[in-house]
Amino acid sequence: MGKGVGRDKYEPAAVSEQGDKKGKKGKKDRDMDELKKEVSMDDHKLSLDELHRKYGTDLSRGLTSARAAEILARDGPNALTPPPTTPEWIKFCRQLFGGFSMLLWIGAILCFLAYSIQAATEEEPQNDNLYLGVVLSAVVIITGCFSYYQEAKSSKIMESFKNMVPQQALVIRNGEKMSINAEEVVVGDLVEVKGGDRIPADLRIISANGCKVDNSSLTGESEPQTRSPDFTNENPLETRNIAFFSTNCVEGTARGIVVYTGDRTVMGRIATLASGLEGGQTPIAAEIEHFIHIITGVAVFLGVSFFILSLILEYTWLEAVIFLIGIIVANVPEGLLATVTVCLTLTAKRMARKNCLVKNLEAVETLGSTSTICSDKTGTLTQNRMTVAHMWFDNQIHEADTTENQSGVSFDKTSATWLALSRIAGLCNRAVFQANQENLPILKRAVAGDASESALLKCIELCCGSVKEMRERYAKIVEIPFNSTNKYQLSIHKNPNTSEPQHLLVMKGAPERILDRCSSILLHGKEQPLDEELKDAFQNAYLELGGLGERVLGFCHLFLPDEQFPEGFQFDTDDVNFPIDNLCFVGLISMIDPPRAAVPDAVGKCRSAGIKVIMVTGDHPITAKAIAKGVGIISEGNETVEDIAARLNIPVSQVNPRDAKACVVHGSDLKDMTSEQLDDILKYHTEIVFARTSPQQKLIIVEGCQRQGAIVAVTGDGVNDSPALKKADIGVAMGIAGSDVSKQAADMILLDDNFASIVTGVEEGRLIFDNLKKSIAYTLTSNIPEITPFLIFIIANIPLPLGTVTILCIDLGTDMVPAISLAYEQAESDIMKRQPRNPKTDKLVNERLISMAYGQIGMIQALGGFFTYFVILAENGFLPIHLLGLRVDWDDRWINDVEDSYGQQWTYEQRKIVEFTCHTAFFVSIVVVQWADLVICKTRRNSVFQQGMKNKILIFGLFEETALAAFLSYCPGMGVALRMYPLKPTWWFCAFPYSLLIFVYDEVRKLIIRRRPGGWVEKETYY
């Protein structure tokens, strides 16, 4: 890990004069690849002399102040470089000019262009295009502000890393201890840390006293890790003599030499990696882009065709250009941008009620199209609390209750051996409940002490009553705390039972070490010699519990004889003056971080929904595999290569990996794999567990899944997960246990840390995709009755049947609430029983949807509108045949004697009132046919009668659009404001037959689709 990596990422790349962008891009990619590699350092392998030579540090006096200042000037401060952030105004501009908005802007500009052409060439130009341009601009700006506000609630990634950086550090310089600002710590500094401190930089430990650090934010291991000067592992992340920047020292003290600072630390590399990753385009953004291409294509095709046609029909150039612009603008669905935004927002709110907080609106749908979930183990699939799972005493394994509400199995608590075992577990234990929690349930109480001891404390408190009282009865005299060399913990207590000797020695520790110190064993309360048979029984039990991925501890005791150890005897723990061999073995207790109750069911749902769940954890492979089996990630009956080898009793190398459906991959193996080998694993195994993985490997796994074409969701809670969260199509962070950093990198936060909430999210995401299709189908259909009047106006030269203002009243008025109401529609079938959609083939808007909306339903709607138009003009004396070619005279304000079919003469004002009445009636007809369209859009396959009319918002939408249409028609003053005139009641009914026709036509179509799945009708019309 060269000194320069990380830091030079932010310095401008050396680029030639021509500004060779390729070079810059290549350099950035190289840097990112460099960061993705495993941490490479050798400081943990060096002896103290070699360290002294490498860093020039006196191991007792530290650096001199002058030397420290030189290094500080060379390396810069010990701080993380903030990433280049996107300014707020650019984010706002993205909302204003991104995707769909661009289409509306082009429409608005074209409107202003058309208006300026008219203003320049006509004496009294009509203001329609001006109004339209203003309205389009307003729609984009309002919707843009709304989306920006929705997303501005989430903030930037790096600031949370800053909260993790320690403020002060204790260094030794010139032989004196001094507290300095952590930013001034330099490579080679001698640093001291104690329990409660944050580690100020990456340190090579040179001396330690009972030091333990919490690496969970970095490696995901929930247990505190011991730190000592010993070199214990080739991998720097696993060895005991390196402590990492910004992890916490939990207990003890240590002294170390700084080997890396700032961006060059392991944490700094992760920070740089997370901020340097480009998040790809969300699936829904890609869908909307595809949709815009289709709409633009249709608009331009129609516009250009009619432009050429109008020139053939001998219109002037200027008129033809205005027609061209009018047609393109008429194709733009003005209300759709707002509809999509509101639908996504509603779903986001609905998900928040179900404990999924969505930060990025488009991520709502991404979760629905997810095909692979890479889940962290600790805290997501498990409860993140060590719990006693099994005991072995009286030569049999007993199961403890690990459920969250203690509703599980229980065991025989009356055995004398169990009483002895629980006594050791309670006494030889330094964990205590924190104060004032008596009224809380035992499992919910906070404990001071390490995870395993807390588990024992809670278990004994549940089974045997107050541990505090037990400890008061058996007063502690002396203890030897646990350390890594002898691997046991021992204490001696006063024994209140007068029938027994007055001193009781209790010990717990690594099972094999404890057994070595015992010569007898307690069976059913009686002490018996420990023979080979019993030793084998112990070995089998130990292997079985260990194979379940559980952490096993052994327990033994000894009553110290009164004649050697009378009352008041001075026990000495340094120069041990009491027996620590020939003890009596009592039993084993094993602990595990148990799966959450709802997870197996959730994993099952994912499987039936076609989603592959992969476990990626920093934990031990055996534990990972046990939990994977417990939650169903590895299902019953599926074997790994190791299982097959064990069953057939052959070496692993002889098993064909393709025979195993499941596989457990160790991080160290992953390190040596090529991307092709990883691809093979992901392709040929359905159930995969990655164990002992590093943060960089998580990222490589996510990229591997994406290479397979999967849409990947990643869950995580540690800092170590942030690069993977950022790279995934959707990152899901934990709300309770998650570090700030992971929450910043994610798109979604699980407020209850429960994997099961993801499944709810998937369901909501799939539903919104279906419902957006319905919404778009509904909205697009009214485009045809809006465009055709304009086209017929050009071709047949008839008076304009529908005006611009009325089109806006439909798109931004009557159609809005019904379109949004479809977001509340319930799923037609079990959406969690089908495969995830394929983003390449299953589009939001496909040719079939366009053909249904434009070609079939839209055409029937247009017929309904024209029927009403011809009825009104005929009632006023203009028969349809008489209208052909009438446009030029009709629109000429200087001609006041246009004759109708019966010879009556009409002035310009009178003609226009009839024309605007037709506009109003055409508008009302569209509302009437949209009733049927709304009802048929409720379902894509089922009959409306199967689905029912339970959607109250949709029923409200039907009434709302009708009321709005009536208001616009009958409200006094509308004739002046919007040029809309009152209609005769009978004119409302002209479109009813067409509305009924749409309903019947679509019900028949869906019936055929249900009767003949995969047939011609489904292939051509099922969107």
Swiss-Prot record:
It catalyses: K(+)(out) + Na(+)(in) + ATP + H2O = K(+)(in) + Na(+)(out) + ADP + phosphate + H(+). Its EC number is 7.2.2.13. The modification N6-succinyllysine is found at K661. It comes from the Eukaryota. InterPro entries: ATPase_P-typ_cation-transptr_C, ATPase_P-typ_cation-transptr_N, ATPase_P-typ_cyto_dom_N, ATPase_P-typ_P_site, ATPase_P-typ_TM_dom_sf, ATPase_P-typ_transduc_dom_A_sf, Cation_transp_ATPase_P-type, HAD-like_sf. Residues 82-84 are annotated as: Phosphoinositide-3 kinase binding. CDD domains: P-type_ATPase_Na-K_like (cd02608). Residues 1-11, 28-39 have a biased composition (Basic and acidic residues). This is Sodium/potassium-transporting ATPase subunit alpha-1. It comes from Homo sapiens. The gene is ATP1A1.
